[in-house]
């Protein structure tokens, strides 16, 4: 989250495991009334979601927002495509990135900032299996170093 503001609602934990995130953007979401109520209740899943640039606009696909319990007939479709609000310069940068081979737009975090739902969108390149193994080895080595350091402290 930029500048440490906002209340974290949902986080895509697999994103950093599956992608090398090179750049992040903060985007607003176009939502219906019952969707924002469900988001505030924390009933959101970013797991399989992704963003696409279509006709000069950015859309978020497969983000699951559970129907609002008191919404009755005004409830929304949980998996509908939602428009992301970004500046024109940012959209043109994203178009340039997505035209390059291997880059994807991955939602990283969903949070509420100043009363509005915001999405942290990352531009990432997919990791191969050996990259993931390498990262796991680095993390394990770091844990070993920290463990040894703590043992010396005692």
Swiss-Prot record:
One of its GO terms (molecular function) is RNA binding. It is found in: Cytoplasm. InterPro entries: SmpB, SsrA-bd_prot, SsrA-bd_prot_CS. One of its GO terms (biological process) is trans-translation. Residues 131-154 have a biased composition (Basic and acidic residues). Keywords: Cytoplasm, RNA-binding. Its main location: cytoplasm. It comes from the Bacteria. Residues 126-154 are annotated as: Disordered. Required for rescue of stalled ribosomes mediated by trans-translation. Binds to transfer-messenger RNA (tmRNA), required for stable association of tmRNA with ribosomes. tmRNA and SmpB together mimic tRNA shape, replacing the anticodon stem-loop with SmpB. tmRNA is encoded by the ssrA gene; the 2 termini fold to resemble tRNA(Ala) and it encodes a 'tag peptide', a short internal open reading frame. During trans-translation Ala-aminoacylated tmRNA acts like a tRNA, entering the A-site of stalled ribosomes, displacing the stalled mRNA. HAMAP family: SmpB (MF_00023). NCBIfam families: PRK05422.1, smpB. This is SsrA-binding protein. It comes from Anoxybacillus flavithermus (strain DSM 21510 / WK1). The lineage of its organism: Bacteria, Bacillati, Bacillota, Bacilli, Bacillales.
């Amino acid at each position: 989250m930029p500048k440490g503001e906002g209340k974290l609602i949902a986080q895509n934990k697999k994103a950093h495991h599956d992608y090398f995130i090179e750049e992040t953007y903060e985007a607003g979401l176009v939502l219906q009334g019952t969707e924002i109520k469900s988001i505030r209740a924390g009933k959101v899943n970013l797991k399989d979601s992704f963003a696409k640039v279509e006709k000069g606009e950015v859309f978020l696909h497969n983000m699951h927002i559970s129907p609002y319990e008191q919404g009755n007939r005004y409830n929304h479709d949980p998996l509908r495509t939602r428009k992301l609000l970004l500046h024109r310069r940012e959209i043109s940068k994203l178009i340039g990135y997505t035209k390059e081979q291997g880059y994807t737009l991955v939602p990283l975090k969903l949070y509420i900032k100043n009363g509005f739902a915001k999405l942290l969108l990352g531009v990432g390149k997919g990791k191969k299996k050996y990259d993931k193994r390498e990262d796991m080895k680095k993390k394990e080595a770091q844990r070993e170093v920290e463990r040894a350091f703590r043992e010396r402290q005692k």
